[in-house]
C-alpha cells in the first residue's frame, strides 16, 4: 500500500469490498423478495420497517470496528508488531462484549421503539418478531465486522468476501426452505439470517486463528489493553456516531414513511435495496481511503495520501453513477423482483427516481470523511454529519413534510442533505489536510 502504483491497488482492495457489501445486501434482498413474493405485503413491510432501527443499534459499534481498521493499519505502516497484536486482541474482545450488549438491549426495546416509530398496526406483530430473532445473531455480526476490519487493515478484502459468500448461500437456501416449504414467514427469514451470520463470523475467526504473525489471533491473549482501547475509541466512536446520526435521521424518516401506510413502507423497502447497492460502491472506496491513507500516513508518505483522495473520489463517483443509472433505467424490471402490487410499486418508483438517481452525491462526504479518519481526524466528520444530515433531515420532517404531506416531499430531503453535507465535508477535508501536512513538514524539518 505504501509503494508503487496506487490506482490498481485501490481497485483490488475496493472491488472485493464492494462485492462483499453488495453480496450481503443481495442476500438481505433475498429476505425481502422471499417474504414479498411468498408471504404477504405485511411481512415485506415488517422486514423493511426494521432496517433503519437495526442500523441505529449497530452503527456505533461498526464505527469502533472502523477505528480498529485505522489503528491497526497505522501500526502496520509503522511496522510496530507488538502494538498490532495488542490492537487485534482488544478489538475482538470489544466485538464480543458489544455484540451481547446490543443483543440483550434489543430484546427489551424492540416493541416500544417500533411502536414509537409508528409502525402500522397490521405490521407491528411481525416486525417485533423479526427484530427479536434477528438480534440473537448480533454477537456474530460484530465478530464478522471486527474480524473483517482487521483483515482489511492489511489490504486483504478478498477473504471477507469468501466468508460472506458462504454465509449468503446458506442464507438463501434456508430462506427458501423455511419460508416457502415450512411457511414460517418473517420468523423463517430471521432464523436464516442468524444462522448465516454464525457462518460468516466463524469463517473470519478461523482465518484469523490461522493467520501469520503479527495478525494471528490467539484466544488466550484476548484482553482489553487500555491504550489500544483508547485509540480504537478515539477514532471509532466519532465514526460510529456519524453512522448513528444517519440512522437516527433515517428512523425519523421511517416513522414518517409509516404514516403513509403499509404500501409505502413496502415500496420504500423494495427501492431501498437498490439505493444500498449503489451506495456500497461509495462506501467501498471510502473504506479504501481510510485504510490506504492510514498506512501511508503512518509511513510518512504524505503526497501519496493526497493522491489516494483523488483516486478514490473519481472511482466512487463513476462506479456509483453507473450502477444508479442501470437501476433507474431498468426500474420496472428490478422492482418487480420484490413485488407486483401496483400500489406498492408506485411508492417504490418515487423513491428510486428521487434518491437512487442522485446517490453519487454521497461520494463528496464519504470519501472526504474517510480520508480525514485515515489522517486521525474522526470527530470533525461526525460533527458535520450531525449538522448536515441529522439536524437538517429532522428540520425538514418537522416543517416541509407537515406542510405538504406527500411521499415525494419526504424523499427529496435525501439529495438536499447530501449536497449540504458534501460541501461542508469537502471544505473541512482541505482545511485538515493543510493543517496536518504543514505540521508534519515542520516536525520532519525539526522546526
Segments the model singles out, each with a brief description of its role:
Residues 39-52, 127, 131, 190, ...:
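Small-residue hotspots at the loop-to-helix junctions and early N-terminal turns
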Residues 32, 41-44, 81, 110, ...:
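Membrane-helix interface/capping residues of multi-pass secondary transporters
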